[in-house]
Amino acid sequence: MSLVTSLTYVLPHRLLSSLARALAYSQTPSTKQWLIDTVTRKFGVDLSEAQEPDPHAYPTFNAFFTRALKPGARVPDADPSAVLMPADGRISQLGPVENGRIFQAKGQSFTAAELLGDEAAAAPFNDGVFATVYLSPKDYHRVHMPWTGTLRETVHVPGRLFSVGPDAVRKVPRLFARNERLVCHFDTEFGPMASVMVGALLVSGVETVWSGVEIPRYGDRITRKDYRGKGVVLEKFAEMARFNYGSTVIVLLPPGVATLDGGLAAETSVRLGQALARRQ
């Protein structure tokens, strides 16, 4: 285990993330520009596809980090049976949900019930498929809909804020089921679909298109919001949320619905809108 990963066990996760949020929203010109320039240089951020390509035009670091893309920079797969990749990034893992468990890395797994915070909510995904997509600091940080769905419920599951970088994924047991996360349950024409936005060290929040910034007060209780009957319908490929720093999204599909694209594997670089799976 690397020194950085070892340190994440003892670091004050929430304090650091609160400080990161304050910096991310700072409008002090020297502060925000130093952050933008540092991240652009360190991670090789490409602004040529951004709707605003001038790094000096963003009022805050967060505005830069959650930047929009130019129209047409990403297009959905033309096959109507394609279940779409929800974000730019890299496949951490994908595959079947076997015996209710989701593979994290060699020797590491966690249950769907742990991830979703609910045994009953996890049951429909047993023997289904999952995909875990890691968004690095250089990536486009908006998450989109794999398929058209009606929002049924969101569940805020409190937890730690470990790094979700590759070393942590390999070494921290049950990482994604331990970090703070926002579970979004959708009803679709093929049944339930879940998109899980996993927080991480320095992630200052998740912002959804239906309720804005989701930064619940820290606590040890799961918080649910019921959206049934409220008509929150999001079309396939539409934006659903954005990370206010890099992290991970996990998509769960029920069994017998779709087959994962054969060209995908762990460590594959992916782009929003390409085929994640195809309807059976």
Swiss-Prot record:
Keywords: Cell membrane, Decarboxylase, Lipid biosynthesis, Lipid metabolism, Lyase, Membrane, Phospholipid biosynthesis, Phospholipid metabolism, Pyruvate, Zymogen
Recorded superkingdom: Bacteria
Cofactor binding annotation: Binds 1 pyruvoyl group covalently per subunit.
Main location: membrane
Record field: catalytic activity: a 1,2-diacyl-sn-glycero-3-phospho-L-serine + H(+) = a 1,2-diacyl-sn-glycero-3-phosphoethanolamine + CO2
Pathway it works in: Phospholipid metabolism; phosphatidylethanolamine biosynthesis; phosphatidylethanolamine from CDP-diacylglycerol: step 2/2
InterPro entries: PS_Dcarbxylase, PSD-B, PSD_type1_pro
Gene Ontology molecular-function annotations: phosphatidylserine decarboxylase activity
Biological process terms in GO annotation: phosphatidylethanolamine biosynthetic process
Subcellular location: Cell membrane
First-tier enzyme category under EC: lyase
Cofactor requirement: pyruvate
Family: Belongs to the phosphatidylserine decarboxylase family. PSD-B subfamily. Prokaryotic type I sub-subfamily.
HAMAP family: PS_decarb_PSD_B_type1
Protein name: Phosphatidylserine decarboxylase proenzyme
Species per Swiss-Prot/TrEMBL record: Xanthomonas axonopodis pv. citri (strain 306)
Gene designation: psd
